[in-house]
Amino acid sequence: MKKGSFSLFCGSVLILLLTLFFTACGGGSSSSNPPPPPPPPPPPTTQVNVTVNVLTDRHFISPFVYGVNFPNNPAYVQDTGTTMVRWGGNAATPYNWKNFDTNASADWYFQNRPWDSSASPAWPVDSVQYITAVKNAGGFPIMTVGMLPWVAKDGLFNSVSFSISKYAYTACKINPYYSDDGDGTKAPCGGSTTNYVTSNDPNDAYVPLLDSQNAGDPAGSVYRNQWVTSLAAAFGNSGACPVPYFPNGSCHFYDMDNEIDIWSGTHRDVHQAGSGYNELSNTFVSESRAVKGWDPLAVRFGPVSCCWYYYWNLPSATDNKGTHANVDFLPWWLNDVYWQDQIAGSRSLDALDVHAYTDADPSQLSLANQRALALSITQDWWNPGFHTPAWFGSNSVTSSQALDGNPFRIPRMRAMVNANYPGTPLAMTEWSFAMAGESDFSTALADADAWGILGRERVTYSTRWTAADPANAAYNALKLYTNYDGAHHGFNAISVSATHNADPALFSVYGTTNPAGTSLTLVVVNKDPSNAAQTTLNLGGFTPSQVTTYTLSQSSPNSIVAGTSHTWSSTMTFPSYTATLLVITGTTASAPAAEWDLNPDTIAVPAGGTVTLHPRLVSGSTSLTISTGTFDAGITPTVTSSTVSGSQQGAVQIVAGNVPGFYHFNVQASDNTTQGGWIVVNKPAASLAKTAGDSQTGAHGTVLPVPLTVTLSPGSSGGTAGGGSVFFSTSAGSLSNGTTSGTKVIAVTNGSGVASVTLTLPGTAGPVTVTAEGPYGLGHPLVTFTETAQ
């Protein structure tokens, strides 16, 4: 140490000691406490603009979208305000209504068991009593009626379809609780259908399910007519639906079986051949009409399709797309059922029911990515620009559908059914977004998103698979819409336009108002796991005064936390990973005197085709003048009849361009309301040409000598010439296709695309017009024959 350093060091120590002394005694400071730490930084935020307009896209939300499969007890229905309660699933197909037993089918080794009430022991296992219990809880049951001819003979564990000892095979999988029960597949294993046991006797586990009793029926047979008659009595004689804003005259809801397109997988012990086009149409029509005969108030759902691939294809080796002009299955099925109903003069289909799983596979993803998938994949249901990460995003399985890697599921299904069977609503009786598991909070946020989508996109019936456990946050996601305050107040009845400028994978908003125009409810879902959403809310047509928030968050997943009511502010911050309901009071200065719709708002059209919409009043009484609003390039709408009143519908003609895709348009009304819709432009239509039999003259009451003949040419439609259905109808006389006769008949094209019918002229002289219509799934080409009876 250098000279002088020691004295400097000692001086420094002395100064330090004096400083510590005075600090400890209060010297040198005006306060006894250290200065407070700086406040934590605010959470990261994103800026979002939300625009709500109570005069745009107004429509009543069906109360039946707030449904579930198998809630765990009646209190669940009462607390959540669940409307539709479904008795369904694979086990519903072989359910025996007399002994309350079923077969687990492919879900568990094709083994008999009692109807499973373990998950919901408070419910009756008797299907008839189940209806009564659901109704007493305030819900509306939808019952599944099996269409296969077998039901479980008992609930014994040793009643199995593929006994290893009886059928002497080496099973690929064996029931761990009963060693004689195999899965019906034999070595070499690997999933090939050629390795299935096909010699099994259904009587091992089943008894026949027949429509009605006849002499000589096998012992133990069970009868549908007796069952449905009992169900109808439990539903009640009036059948009326006491639900506001919903015009359906009956609540006797029936699913006509479950996922009938995959019977050869789930129920291959009794249905080994792949389901086929004609089979599924004819079986549905026959059984549906029978149900209507036993219960005149029946509302029948079909075909209860399982999933994307089977919307468009069936597994039959001989009764498939290839033998039906290459028409995609659901368009073909709807078309065929519609034409059969036209011939019969009455409906057999009251709602198109599809299961709406997205087919996205989360199994190989990290937890964070599973959560992100759950919150982005909801776009499968509604976003025209969303390209699915599921397998079919890069594997087209359709023949004629537009942009089939972009599911656009709800508008696509509604467009299809409106084109193929007008006036038929859409049901989605199974769906789930539990990519990270039922208990994960991402599932609750995805559900909050889903319930909003269902109402905005005009689905009529929906039941979640299965009901969320009350211990999980997803339970409260439903209550945001149905019972947010414990007093059974819910989302308002009339959906209105609510849009935003954020990433839809991270943010959603849904809006509704009440008929009086005094309340606006918004559900805001901030799906961003990291960032709060600093949001500017622009309200059009509504003057707000007070707002109360109700929030579901990760920090309080088992309750909906109510905020205090306060004066409206147009700027609000929504924390990350939350779903928030805003209940806003105020006024609508120019509340419309009536509600109207585009009738329909969404429809499918072939490229280059034309469709006419017929705007109508759906409530209230006034007279409106409509005009064309904005529309996407690729379609051209023109108002051809501008008056809409209680006694008159308007008319909007829309001409599609030549590029398949999804095109949006708006129509404005003189009361400042606007309705928007979608045109789904598919591939170009096939052509149908008259090739023989036109312009004939014959004596009245005689058969014209030349059959009325058409030729179907698929062109660029995606179809083929052979196996196409052609619907012939005559203004007088009778048609025959060689098998059936009447004023309306269906003929099928041969391999060259040719179909024909014979015409018997009427008994009186005069002109006769015969119309021939090609498949709706190939653009619905048509031609007209003109004949003369002398």
Region annotations inferred by a language model:
Residues T51-Q226, D255, I260-G276:
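N-terminal substrate-binding region of glycoside hydrolase catalytic domains
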Residues L18-P44, T673, W678, L782:
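Bacterial Sec-dependent N-terminal signal peptides
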Residues W596-L598, T612-L617, S621, T628-Q790:
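The feature marks long extracellular or luminal low-complexity segments
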Residues P218-G239, Y277-S442, D447:
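Noncatalytic carbohydrate-binding groove/subsite architecture in carbohydrate-active enzymes
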Residues H566-A589:
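C-terminal beta-strand-rich structural cap/linker in extracellular carbohydrate-active enzymes
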Residues N33-Y76, A234-F235, P244, S281, ...:
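N-terminal module-boundary/linker segments of secreted carbohydrate-active enzymes
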Residues D440, W451-T521:
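Glycan-recognition and catalytic regions of carbohydrate-active enzymes
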Residues D503-T543, Y577-T585:
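Carbohydrate-binding surface patches
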